[in-house]
Amino acid sequence: MNSRESDAAMPFPPPKHRRLKRAGLIALAVVIGYAILAYLALPAVWTHYEHQKGLAELPMVTRTAQGIPGDPINVGLVGDNKDVLCAMHAAGWYPADPITLKSSIEIAGSVLLDRPYRDAPVSNLYYLGRREDLAFEKPDGRSADHRHHVRFWKVLDQGEEKRPVWLGDAAFDKSVGASRYTGAVTHHIDADVDAERKFLATDLQAAGMVEAKYQVTGVGPTMAGRNGGGDLYYTDGEVWILRLVEACRKRTGPAIVIPSPAATEIKDQIWQAVAGTLRK
C-alpha cells in the first residue's frame, strides 16, 4: 500500500467547527437538564402543604412599602388572636410599639445612648398588600439595635385544625444602618433566618405554648437571598407551623412533631450540611 492509499484509509478528524458545535450542544443539554432538575423536578418533589392545604397558593415573601421583596416567611402559628398574644407573652416576647414620632425618638435614643427599649417599633412590611397585624420582639443586650423580632399576618380564618392561621417573618436585628436600596435608616438582620425561626419556636415550646409543630414549604432553599434593606439571608426554605395551646392552657409535655414527607426530610438533611459551611 503506497502512502497515498494509506492516507486515504485513515479517518480524518471532524472539522473544528463541528467539534465546537457538538461541545456546545452538550453544554446546552447540561444547562437545560440542570435547570429542569433544580427549578422544576426537585421543587416539585419537596413542595408540600399536606398539613395546611390553604397555604399552597400564598406567596412566601414579604414586601416593603416600595414593593421590594422583604424578609422571607419562615414561621406560622395556629390559634386565635388571644392565643397568639398569650403565647408570645408567656415566651417573654413584647408587643412592638407602633411607629410614631414619639416611638421613633425613643428608639433613636435607645440606640445612640445604649439604653433599653424592650417594645421598640419594628419597620413595617407588607404581605398580601397589608401591613403586619401583630409584631413582637425580645431584647438581646441593652439597646434596641440588637433584638429578636417577628411580624405576623393572619392569612386563614380557619385552617386544617378549624382555627385561624398566621404567617410570620422571624429575624434577628444585629445592627442599625442605612438601607442599601433606599438609604433610609433601618435595622440590618443576621443572615441565618432559620436560626431565628428556631429561637422563637424554642421559646414558645419552653413556655408550654405549643401543642404540635410541622413544616410547609416556604420560599424554598435559598443561599443568597436579599431582603428589603439589601441584607443577605439564607434559609432551607421551610415554614415551621406551631399549633398553639388554646385558652393559654400550658402544655406539660413536649410538642407533638408531625413529620414532613421523606423527600423533604432528605432535602433538609442535605441543607444542614450546606448551611454549616455558610455559618463559618
What residue spans do the PLM features occupy?
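Short, charged/polar micro-motifs that form catalytic or ligand-binding hotspots
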Residues: 27, 31, 71-78, 142, ...
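N-terminal Lys/Arg-rich, disordered targeting/topogenic segments
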Residues: 1-23
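A broad, low-specificity signal for short, low-complexity segments enriched in glycine/proline
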Residues: 32-39, 56-58, 110-115
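Extracytoplasmic/periplasmic/luminal assembly and interaction segments
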Residues: 76-117
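Terminal, regulation- and interaction-focused segments at domain boundaries
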Residues: 59-85
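Hydrophobic membrane-insertion alpha-helices, especially the h-region
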Residues: 22-44
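Compositionally biased P/S/T/G-rich terminal and signal peptide-adjacent segments
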Residues: 44-65
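A cross-kingdom signal targeting lumenal/periplasmic-facing segments of multi-pass membrane
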Residues: 107-279
